UniProtKB/Swiss-Prot annotation:
PROSITE patterns: RIBOSOMAL_S19 (PS00323). One of its GO terms (molecular function) is rRNA binding. Signal peptide: none annotated. It comes from the Archaea. The lineage of its organism: Archaea, Methanobacteriati, Methanobacteriota, Stenosarchaea group, Halobacteria. Pfam families: Ribosomal_S19. This is Small ribosomal subunit protein uS19. Belongs to the universal ribosomal protein uS19 family. GO terms for cellular component: cytosolic small ribosomal subunit. The keyword Ribonucleoprotein applies. The gene is rps19.
Amino acid sequence: MSTEYRTGREGEFTYRGHDLDELQEMSLEDVAELLPARQRRTITRGLSEEHHKVLAEARESGTEETANNPIRTHLRDMPVLPEFVGLTFAVYTGQEFERVEVQPEMIGHYLGEFQLTRSSVEHGQAGIGATRSSKFVPLK
């Protein structure tokens, strides 16, 4: 599953043959045709009322405003649309809201893909009594 985007020599972002300005001027239905199948299906079946609230809030807020006060959402299944580029979202991970600054390369993914719900555990040394052999380790 590869997304067709690349940065040209001049540093211009393109997504499936369209630059960012073209993508931002397109309607939601036209953008949906360019997205991968799963995200396209999400949009064509109809976004929920909560999705439309986040979309409306994103359209009325500016980049500087969201940098200081990000758009808070529980919707990890919201597809990243071209009009979200430059905005900052606070995506709920199950414990807290984590900031996500939307870059052009994120178009076509879900918001939840950029904030993990589980953290990797780094185990330290076993405690006293954790194993049978550690019962006889002298205390410091």
